[in-house]
C-alpha cells in the first residue's frame, strides 16, 4: 500500500486453487470429461453417435454407419499394436450385449491419446478447483478484486479443458480385413484427427471420407469390382438385399454410410452398357423383367443384380424369337382376327392352343402395261 507492505494471513487464491486441485476425486474428473463429450452432436453421414458407452449393448446393431467415442480410460498411443482402446473397440465390434454383433462393418471409433489424457485430467482438476472457489466465495469472504480474479481463471481453465478434449480425442480407429491375406483377422487402422477448431465428430467424418473408409458416393465401376472379386464369383446374380447385408457385415468390403449410397450406384450403373443388369426375379432358367442400359427409378431390395453376359444372351434370344399366331378368334363384325405374340424360345405354351407361324408376305402383283 504505497510504500508500506504487510503479510496477509490468508493464502493466495492461486495457492488455494492448487491445494484444491489435488483434492479433486478421480470420479469427478471422469464425470466432467464425459459430461462435456456428451454435448457432442451427431453429424452426417453418421446415423448415430455413441459417447462413452458403458457396454456393447449401448451401441445398436443396425445397417447404418455409427461413430463411437470411447471412455477416458480406453486410451491409445502411437505405433501401438495393442492398447486399452483397441481392446474396448474389439469388444463392441464383436458383441452386442450377450449376442454376436452382425453388422460389424458399420462402426468406427474415436479414442483418447494416452499421454494427452494426463494433461486433460490436470486441466479438469484446475477447472474444478477454481469453480469450487467461486462456489465458496461467500465463505471465503472474497473482495471485488478477488472475485474478478476467480472469474478470469475459471474462464481460462474452461477454455483449456475444451481445447485439451479436442487434442486428446485424436485417434480414429477403423476395423478392416485384407481378404487377400486373412479373411478372419481384424486389423485396426489408427489415424490422427487432431488439429483444427472443428468438433471431434466433424473431424472424424472428414477424415473417413477423405480416406474412403466411409463412402457417401460410390461409382458403379467400384461396385462391379467388388462383385467380381468376391460376391458373385460363383454365380451369375445376387439379390440386392443380400448384397447390402454383406456390405454392412464384412470388414473386407467397402464401408458405405447408408443404403441409398448403394442404391444410387446401382441406378447409375443400370443407365449404362458397361456394368450389370437388373431383374425382378429368376425362374430357374430365365430372368424376369430383365433390364439394363436404361434409367430405373424404382429399385427394390428383392431385385437381382445380374452379370452382363447372361443378361445379354437372354435379351438377344428374346429379341430374335419368332412371332407366333394364336388360332384366329371371331371379331365383333364376325370376321377373324389373329393375335400375335413374341415369345422367347423356352416360353411354356398351353398345348390346347394351336400356334401358327404367320404366313410369309407375298409380293404385290405388278400391274400389266397398257
Explain the meaning of each model-derived region.
Residues 1-370:
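Extended alpha-helical scaffold and adjacent linker segments that couple domains
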Amino acid at each position: 500500500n504505497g510504500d508500506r507492505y504487510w503479510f496477509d494471513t490468508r493464502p493466495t487464491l492461486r495457492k488455494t486453487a492448487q491445494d484444491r486441485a489435488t483434492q479433486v476425486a478421480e470420479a469427478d474428473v471422469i464425470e466432467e470429461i464425459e459430461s462435456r463429450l456428451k454435448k457432442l452432436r451427431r453429424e452426417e453421414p453418421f446415423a448415430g453417435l455413441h459417447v462413452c458407452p458403458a457396454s456393447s449393448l449401448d451401441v445398436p446393431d443396425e445397417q447404418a454407419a455409427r461413430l463411437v467415442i470411447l471412455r477416458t480410460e480406453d486410451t491409445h498411443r502411437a505405433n501401438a499394436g495393442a492398447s486399452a482402446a483397441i481392446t474396448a473397440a474389439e469388444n463392441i465390434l464383436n458383441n452386442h450385449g450377450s449376442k454376436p454383433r452382425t453388422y460389424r462393418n458399420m462402426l468406427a471409433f474415436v479414442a483418447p491419446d494416452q499421454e494427452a489424457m494426463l494433461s486433460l485430467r490436470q486441466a479438469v482438476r484446475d477447472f474444478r478447483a477454481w469453480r469450487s472457489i467461486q462456489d465458496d466465495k461467500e465463505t471465503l469472504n472474497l473482495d471485488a478484486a478477488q472475485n474478478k480474479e476467480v472469474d478470469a481463471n475459471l474462464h481460462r481453465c474452461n477454455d483449456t479443458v475444451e481445447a485439451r478434449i479436442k487434442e486428446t480425442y485424436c485417434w480414429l480407429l477403423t476395423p478392416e480385413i485384407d481378404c487377400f491375406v486373412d479373411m478372419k483377422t481384424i486389423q485396426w487402422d489408427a489415424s490422427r484427427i487432431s488439429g483444427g477448431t472443428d468438433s471431434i465428430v466433424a473431424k472424424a467424418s472428414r477424415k473417413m471420407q477423405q480416406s474412403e473408409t466411409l463412402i457417401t458416393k460410390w461409382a458403379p465401376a467400384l461396385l462391379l469390382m467388388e462383385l467380381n472379386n468376391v460376391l458373385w464369383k460363383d454365380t451369375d446374380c445376387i439379390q440386392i438385399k443380400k448384397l447390402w447385408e454383406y456390405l454392412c457385415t464384412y470388414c473386407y468390403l467397402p464401408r458405405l454410410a447408408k443404403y441409398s449410397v448403394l442404391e444410387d450406384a446401382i441406378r447409375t450403373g443400370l443407365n449404362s452398357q458397361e456394368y450389370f443388369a437388373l431383374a425382378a426375379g429368376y425362374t430357374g432358367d430365365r430372368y424376369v423383367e430383365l433390364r439394363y442400359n436404361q434409367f430405373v427409378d424404382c429399385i427394390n431390395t428383392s431385385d437381382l443384380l445380374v452379370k452382363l453376359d447372361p443378361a445379354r444372351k437372354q435379351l438377344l434370344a428374346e429379341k430374335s424369337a419368332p412371332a407366333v399366331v394364336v388360332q384366329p378368334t371371331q371379331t365383333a363384325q364376325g370376321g377373324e382376327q389373329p393375335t400375335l405374340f413374341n415369345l422367347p424360345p423356352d416360353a411354356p405354351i398351353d398345348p390346347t392352343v394351336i400356334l401358327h407361324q404367320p404366313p410369309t408376305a407375298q409380293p404385290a402383283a405388278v400391274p400389266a402395261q397398257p
